[in-house]
Amino acid sequence: MADSSFSLPPLCERISYTNYFLRAVYLTVLGLFFSLLLHRIRHTSEYDNVWLVAFFCESCFFLVCLLITCLKWSPADTKPFPDRLDERVHDLPSVDMFVPTADPVREPPIMVVDTVLSLLAVNYPANKLACYVSDDGCSPLTYFSLKEASKFAKIWVPFCKKYNTRVRAPSRYFLKPISVATEDYEFNRDWEKTKREYEKLRRKVEDATGDSHMLDVEDDFEAFSNTKPNDHSTLVKVVWENKGGVGDEKEIPHIIYISREKRPNYVHNQKCGAMNFLARVSGLMTNAPYILNVDCDMYANDADVVRQAMCILLQESLNMKHCAFVQFRQEFYDSSTELIVVLQSHLGRGIAGIQGPIYIGSGCVHTRRVMYGLSPDDFEVDGSLSSVATREFLVKDSLARRFGNSKEMMKSVVDAIQRNPNPQNILTNSIEAAREVGHCQYEYQTSWGNTIGWLYDSVAEDLNTSIGIHSRGWTSSYISPDTPAFLGSMPAGVPEALLQQRRWATGWIEILFNKQSPLRGLFSKKIRFRQRLAYLCIITCLRSIPELIYCLLPAYCLLHNSTLFPKGLYLGITVTLVGIHCLYTLWEFMSLGYSVQSWLVSQSVWRIVATSSWLFSIFDITLKLLGISETVFIITKKTVAGTKSALGSGPSQGEDVGPNSDLFKFEFDGSLCFLPGTFIVLVNIAALAVFSVGLQRSSYSHEGGGSGLAEACGCVLVMMLFLPFLMGLFKKGKYGTPLSTLSIAGFLAVLFVVFSV
């Protein structure tokens, strides 16, 4: 591992940020918010029940604001120095790279291929890497694409390393034409050749997608005969085995295709179960001490990504900081994901300053020993396993009870825990053992998914697993390099994006009610108080109910002639509070290079997600708690870079998206997710119409008077935030509100108006 010589410079540096001005802003916002709530309480008797409802909603918003402030209070980052690893090149550990996929239709094979090719081409010794692709759909098309990709990789990987290309996903690299100013004849020739070969690869994959009979001509595909996505045996195939030596830049890493056994009457635990199967198979074949987990729609955008993670893991292990994993910031090449990037940049750094970032499911380098259930207390100062842990973990009966009855698996676990050198075995010799650990019943009565590996009982397996790791006392590190380490694609279209947000929120809320969830670990002394608050951020999804109510309150007050906002001085406090919040969030966007329009669009997106996806996630969890239905892991449809739908020519991070922002290309379908937004817009239109013609009822307030200009401005602001739904009322086709949605929303709006007037 890392050289222990103190004369060597540090591999990484932890940077803590202290901005007293921002802290003053946080405290000012909280102070104004608290004074507004006090005013609500003191004058409740002077107004009707609207003030009580407003107090409830604003109290929820205050708690969320307080929670976010606690997390942002002491941001931190980690700066790696990958160039310094060259002094320790012989000490670099092996890394197993996991790429899970499940559906060749919703996750196109060429997209999976691009991700794999980008990982194969990273700046790291090829004989130290192994790429495992888990295909939960058992698709011959995915396997075919992987085989063809392995042939192209023999051209692509040497090309990338020879010319030190920055982007190593071919679909993204070849979007930009070769520079006319480039006079290097050899480079031009190699560039043209590599591009031609990549286009051949794409055509082969596309042809095979359109004609599945092409796959039947090869004997290698006989194993896929009579297989179904949810009914098939375990498949383990070595696509390519690296047999080269150290420093051979023409070699490519191992490529292994796996698909675990699936039967209709067995629970498979979705992606989480696939990740645990990847952990077992890789343990049997290569057993690298570190694991890089990347979603199939996220490619490596920085060639030094593995080296950056190693800087932290090797440095942390040297100083015994108990670092369990390194999480990279999740970024996208789509032009509609500014909000996610901003949240991760500011909130992610804040959490990194506590016990470490939360594992977000992709772009993360794990330590295998940690994933096998060990805690920092199980190790001595020098990093060796303690005598107590040795007796507990390495006894044969204990190993079988925890990891299953496979002798080969138990041996690999012992080697991984003790950090024994992994001999360069022939991969094909481990195929039978790998198939054994892929059986449906293998995990039965073991600790897989409970305390070992990726944890079950939630569709948000990343958050569940992260809680389990931190509750054992581990820390984690956050890297936010200037060049995004990984870039991914958001789901194709607004309906798919809202569906993904609904799935995420469902998993987050589900953790609150899980009997087997490691959420109980939040009360462990090994997890810091503010880190507990970081995980309790999942309750922000529950604010969708007060958010929906608050969007309707101005309209209700106009119809009912009630007062929502305070008068005089406290109206000024309310306006000041909103103004400071807007200026602060605008600064967050502009500090990352985004425009004012990007900020405006993101404010609208945030409201839409909160009142649609998050709202229906609460409905999903309610049905589960009542025993009516179970939560379902939904695979969202992904787009391929370079296609029109993928916004391949769209701006990168920090660029202005211009007037053709996705806000003005809001696509509708018949999904119920569009119902709340349409309903909100119709209600506010009706309220403004009633107010403008003076058809309000007489005020029943005691001393507060009726509604006025402030409530009308509130309605206008709500409609501005839901502008896509307002525009959808006047458009046709996919950019217009479907008649079914409009009819239901209109009926509900009429009921709301009738009972409000």
Swiss-Prot record:
Quote the Pfam families the UniProt record gives: Cellulose_synt
Give the top-rank taxon of the lineage listed in the UniProt record for this protein. Answer: Eukaryota
Localization, UniProt: Golgi apparatus membrane
Give any Gene Ontology cellular component. Golgi membrane
Tissue specificity, in the record's words, reads: Expressed in young seedlings, primarily in the vascular tissue.
Q: Which InterPro entries match?
A: Cellulose_synth, Nucleotide-diphossugar_trans
- Specify the enzyme's EC class, one word: transferase
Keyword vocabulary terms for this entry = Cell wall biogenesis/degradation, Coiled coil, Glycosyltransferase, Golgi apparatus, Membrane, Transferase, Transmembrane, Transmembrane helix
Enzyme Commission number: 2.4.1.-
Q: Topology with regard to the membrane?
A: Multi-pass membrane protein
What are the recorded Gene Ontology BP terms? cell wall organization; cellulose biosynthetic process
What protein family does this chain belong to?
Belongs to the glycosyltransferase 2 family. Plant cellulose synthase-like B subfamily.
Report the protein's function.
Thought to be a Golgi-localized beta-glycan synthase that polymerize the backbones of noncellulosic polysaccharides (hemicelluloses) of plant cell wall.
UniProt name for this protein: Cellulose synthase-like protein B1
